[in-house]
Amino acid sequence: MLHNGNAEITGCAAGVTALEIPAEIDGSPVTAVGDSAFLKQQKLQTVSLPDSVQSIGSQAFSGCINLQEITVPSGTQSVSNSAFSGCTNLEKAVLGDSVETLGSSVFSGCESLAEVQLSANLQKMGGSVFQNCTALKTVAIPEQVQTLGGSTFSGCSRLYQVKLPAKMTEIQSCAFEDCPKLETLTLPESLTTLGYGAFQNCSGLQNISLPEQVTEVGDYAFAHCTALEQAAVSGNVLTLGKNMFCDCRRLAEVTLAEGLTELGNSMFLDCVSLQAVTIPDSVTQIGESTFSGCTDLQHVTLPQNLKQIGGNAFRNCSSLTAVAFPEKLKSIGNEAFSGCSGLQEALLPDATDTLGYSVFYGCTSLERVRLSDEITELGQTVFRQCKKLPEITLPKELTTIGESTFFSCDGFTRVEIPDGTQRIGSNAFSYCTNLKEVVIPKSVTQIGGAFESFAGCDSLTDVYYAGSEEDWNKIRFCTTLDKILKVRIHFNGELSVTTTTPAGTTTATETTATTTVTTATEPVVPFMKGDVDGDGKIDSSDVFAAMLYVAYTAVGRAGNLTDDQMQAADIDESGSIDSTDVYYLLYYIALNGAGVRSTWADVVK
């Protein structure tokens, strides 16, 4: 094909094995090999290109599976996208020094390519140029190249040595992803940007140091580099990406530079060899799951300007024994220290006003806790199974104790709930087996929710209530089975031994002066979640009642449940009763029947 007096090669006959392209055709110089000119010429083995060729088009030789060697002539300036992609038997490629531009995926999938000589004047490389070149072992990027495109060497499973140019400023996403033989790499001092997953799954990489000029590091940059032992993050980086070093299982030493303001989510997730880390004072926020699963982490120095610790930040850091919380810390997210079984104390500063749920769940060695008086609510399971915690002083401004907040805190013998607290949630103190005394203020209006608050507190003998017996009987209890209703109640500081009985009967009341018989006022007992038939317990009859309701309503019949019973049957609180609620009922009964103490919060997730 002729264009402006120049000839472009557009193809050849099928089945050709050797191809020699002439320098001119009918007096017109051959300057280009057109797009897809020899696409999938599967018998083609050798190609000779003249120096007159200035450009090689997209997919020009793509899929030529028997082509073994290619020399791009000295006159060629550009090689377009996928020009030699999928040439699975191509072993050697030499690019003349006039080549300035390589398009994307030029040699992608050339799985036999072991030797590459790039043009000394190469300036631009597209993404995926050598993607999945599984035989490639070494390569030197020419000095004029400033950007390494995305996935350039992704999947080069034998690549072990790469020389990067001194002037390179950017390594784009997944550039070296899945290069397991790459053990060492020196990043150029001019580098400013490291893209998403740039070295992800480089399982042989042993150490890395980010240069001073780096300002941006993408998510997963070094994720799953399982041999990485040392990492230094320096320079002007303000934010480190999510999962940056996640699953770097040998990472034992990390240096973080001053200037960072945030540690990204899951940054060191499951770095099981990391033993100590000092976080720069410039950091104000630690993301979610940042150090989660760092089971060898023993020492962490939190920055003085830290304001927020994200959810799961130190979850299951079982070797962590102590943490010094800085004075400016405002909030700690859900499960932040859950499963830190070695943590012995948690002394929170006055500024901390928010604790998420399960923050210290399963901290079985925790013996000392200080809470800020600014905290108004303790969420569900915050201190669940903190079995060694002997006591706790609750915040003065506390209004709500959530579900299972102190579940199975066996060290408690006495608990004083502060004045102003209004609600004590389901299982809040359940199975605190050594709890003997509880002080409850007059401000409390509800004890329990979907379940009782003091179930399994077999040592509980005395409750000291600030109000009168009349006030006590106005409190909403989830069930008359709650242990707290079976012990001595001290009203207004006066000892009373009461027995709660059904409405219409009497309660004997003893005081130090006289013994009187008074009419009992049954506590207000709303529905109990799961107790569909209203008999005060949760068992198979409740499952049957719920199933019957679902079956009846499915065929247009009345379900025959009262409003309270329907509310009790709506386990997931979706506003309707269906097979999901029946499943949750069965699951709850099975767990508790097997001896696994569980709440509705454990079942409905």
Predicted regions and their residues:
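Structural signature of tandem-repeat unit edges
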Residues: 3-5, 14-31, 42-55, 65-78, ...
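Extracellular/luminal Pro/Thr/Ser-rich low-complexity repeat and linker "mucin-like" segments
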Residues: 5-10, 15, 378, 533-547
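Short, solvent-exposed loop/turn elements at domain surfaces
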Residues: 7-8, 18, 555-556
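Consensus positions within tandem repeat domains that build extended binding/scaffold surfaces
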Residues: 34-37, 57-60, 80-85, 103-106, ...
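Short, aromatic/basic amphipathic alpha-helical patches
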Residues: 473-484
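Cellulosome-associated attachment modules in secreted, modular CAZymes
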Residues: 500-605
